[in-house]
Amino acid sequence: MCWAVGRRWAWAALLLAVAAVLAQVVWLWLGTQSFVFQHEEIAQLARQYAGLDHELAFSRLIVELRRLHPGHVLPDEDLQWVFVNAGGWMGAMCLLHASLSEYVLLFGTALGSSGHSGRYWAEISDTIISGTFHQWREGTTKSEVFYPGETVVHGPGEATAVEWGPNTWMVEYGRGVIPSTLGFALADTVFSTQDFLTLFYTLRAYARGLRLELTTYLFGQDA
């Protein structure tokens, strides 16, 4: 019996060691990456349009991002609003840019929703265009509320409770191991709603983003 318990502890220690090494490798890899976007750049652009009708703000933001980063923002024919069910909440997102280490998307809810933020190997920032964003951080007993023009930062490994009021819309930028975020983003769709058409739309949007980045890398911005 003692031998069996010892083996279990040995396996647990080995798994922890592997996880620690993997985490270190990942962060070293991220340190070598050349990023297309910057957190503050996205936040500043979004703040310019905060308080406007969200559809007008989004259309102007897309035009500006394409001007600043040609070849890195999906064309109009590839833009699609897709439902997202994750952590108990429901919203919608429109992916503008995606790679293995970055993404930019539009996100929000027309009805309001709340749930778990998820815990990621990525840093995610949301700059609010309209509505309200309530956040309750792990380890605290009070929530914070954010308004149009403010940016909410979700650090790697952090978890919070989130709540968005009706007609809350924002611009989101993520940097880190982006494929690792898909597990949380898709779990409710696979195991709860079983909305496999939405699953297809989500994966297709990410594939389109990766394809655009590969095309731009291989053939340049005018490809």
Swiss-Prot record:
Cytoplasmic side: 31-223
Ranges where the record places region Targeting to endoplasmic reticulum-associated lipid droplets: 2-8
Region described as C-terminal hydrophobic region: spans on this chain: 177-223
Pfam families: ERG2_Sigma1R (PF04622)
Residue(s) at site: Important for ligand binding: 126, 172
Keyword Endoplasmic reticulum listed: yes
Major location category of this protein: nucleus
Membrane topology: Single-pass membrane protein
GO molecular function: signaling receptor activity
Cell compartments where the protein resides: Nucleus inner membrane; Nucleus outer membrane; Nucleus envelope; Cytoplasmic vesicle
InterPro entries: ERG2_sigma1_rcpt-like
Segments on the Lumenal side according to the record's topology features: 1-9
Residue segments, region Important for ligand-binding: 99-106
Role description: Functions in lipid transport from the endoplasmic reticulum and is involved in a wide array of cellular functions probably through regulation of the biogenesis of lipid microdomains at the plasma membrane. Involved in the regulation of different receptors it plays a role in BDNF signaling and EGF signaling. Also regulates ion channels like the potassium channel and could modulate neurotransmitter release. Plays a role in calcium signaling through modulation together with ANK2 of the ITP3R-dependent calcium efflux at the endoplasmic reticulum.
Oligomer status and interactors: Homotrimer. Forms a ternary complex with ANK2 and ITPR3. The complex is disrupted by agonists. Interacts with KCNA4. Interacts with KCNA2; cocaine consumption leads to increased interaction. Interacts with RNF112 in an oxidative stress-regulated manner.
Family recorded in the similarity comment: Belongs to the ERG2 family.
Record remark: domains: The C-terminal helices form a flat, hydrophobic surface that is probably tightly associated with the cytosolic surface of the endoplasmic reticulum membrane.
Something else known: Sigma receptors are classified into two subtypes (Sigma-1 and Sigma-2) based on their different pharmacological profile.
Official protein name in the record: Sigma non-opioid intracellular receptor 1
